C-alpha cells in the first residue's frame, strides 16, 4: 500500500461483506425452511457461515486498529457515529414491538375478552423473577461503568474484575430468563399476548447474549493489553451497547411485566 499522508483509513479489499451477505441469505432462507419443512440444515449452515464471517471480520478490525495503527482519532470518530446510528436503528426495532404491545393492550378486541391480559392468560408476577432480572441488569450497568472508569485511570486489575462481574451478571440474567420461559403458563402461539411477550423479551434476551459475547471479547483483549486509556473504542462500543440493553429492559419491565399484568 502506498504511503498515506492523511488520517483516514483506506481499507484493503475484503471478502467478508460478501460472505456476510450470503450467510444472512442462508439464515433467513434456512429459518423459513425450518418453520415450514422442519429441516434445520440450511439454517445451521447459515449460522456457521455467519459466525465464521463475524470472527474473521472483527479479527481483521482488531488487527488494523490495535497492531497497524489505522484507527486514528478521525477514524474512531467515524466508528463512534456508526455505533450511535446502529443503536438508534435498534431503538426503532424495539419501538415496533412496543407499538404492537400497546396497540393490542390499550384497546383490546372482543376476541380477547375486551380485557388485558386476555381471558385465559395468567401473566407473570412482576415482583418475582422479573424484578430480580431488573436488579441484575441495573447492577451490571454499575459494574460496566466501574470497568470504564478503571480503564480510564489505567487500573487493569479493577477493569478486568468489573468486566468479569458484568459478564457473569449477563449470564445470570440469561439463565433467569430461560427459567422464566420454562415456567410460563402461556406460549408464543397463545394469541397476541404470547406473541408480543415472547417476541419483545426474546429479542431483548438475544441482545443480552450478544452483549455478553461482546464484553467477553473485550475481556480477552484486555488480558492481551489491547486497550489503553485513550485508545479503547472496542470496549466503549460494548459499554454503549450494554447500557442500551439495560434501558430497553426497564421499558420492557414497566410496560409488559408491570403495567401489562
From Swiss-Prot:
Residues 1-15, 67-72, 153-155, 224-232 are mitochondrial matrix. The chain crosses the membrane at residues 16-34, 41-66, 73-105, 129-152, 156-183, 191-223, 233-256. The keyword Mitochondrion applies. It is a multi-pass membrane protein. Its main location: mitochondrion. Component of the cytochrome c oxidase (complex IV, CIV), a multisubunit enzyme composed of 14 subunits. The complex is composed of a catalytic core of 3 subunits MT-CO1, MT-CO2 and MT-CO3, encoded in the mitochondrial DNA, and 11 supernumerary subunits COX4I, COX5A, COX5B, COX6A, COX6B, COX6C, COX7A, COX7B, COX7C, COX8 and NDUFA4, which are encoded in the nuclear genome. This is Cytochrome c oxidase subunit 3. It comes from Oryctolagus cuniculus (Rabbit). The gene is MT-CO3.
Amino acid at each position: 500500500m502506498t504511503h498515506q499522508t492523511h488520517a483516514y483509513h483506506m481499507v484493503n479489499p475484503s471478502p467478508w461483506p460478501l460472505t456476510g451477505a450470503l450467510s444472512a441469505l442462508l439464515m433467513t432462507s434456512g429459518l423459513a425452511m425450518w418453520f415450514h419443512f422442519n429441516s434445520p440444515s440450511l439454517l445451521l449452515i447459515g449460522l456457521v457461515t455467519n459466525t465464521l464471517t463475524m470472527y474473521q471480520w472483527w479479527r481483521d478490525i482488531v488487527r488494523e486498529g490495535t497492531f497497524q495503527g489505522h484507527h486514528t482519532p478521525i477514524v474512531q470518530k467515524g466508528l463512534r457515529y456508526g455505533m450511535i446510528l446502529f443503536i438508534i436503528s435498534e431503538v426503532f426495532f424495539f419501538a415496533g414491538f412496543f407499538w404492537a404491545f400497546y396497540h393490542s393492550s390499550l384497546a383490546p378486541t372482543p376476541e380477547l375478552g375486551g380485557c388485558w391480559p386476555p381471558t385465559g392468560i395468567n401473566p407473570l408476577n412482576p415482583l418475582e423473577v422479573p424484578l430480580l432480572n431488573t436488579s441484575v441488569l441495573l447492577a451490571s450497568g454499575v459494574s460496566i461503568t466501574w470497568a470504564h472508569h478503571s480503564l480510564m485511570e489505567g487500573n487493569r486489575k479493577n477493569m478486568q474484575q468489573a468486566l468479569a462481574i458484568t459478564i457473569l451478571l449477563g449470564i445470570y440474567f440469561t439463565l433467569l430468563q430461560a427459567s422464566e420461559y420454562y415456567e410460563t403458563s402461556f406460549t408464543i402461539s397463545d394469541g397476541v399476548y404470547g406473541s408480543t411477550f415472547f417476541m419483545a423479551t426474546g429479542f431483548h434476551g438475544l441482545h443480552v447474549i450478544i452483549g455478553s459475547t461482546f464484553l467477553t471479547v473485550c475481556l480477552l483483549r484486555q488480558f492481551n493489553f489491547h486497550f489503553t486509556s485513550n485508545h479503547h473504542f472496542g470496549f466503549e462500543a460494548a459499554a454503549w451497547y450494554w447500557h442500551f440493553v439495560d434501558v430497553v429492559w426497564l421499558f420492557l419491565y414497566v410496560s409488559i411485566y408491570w403495567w401489562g399484568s
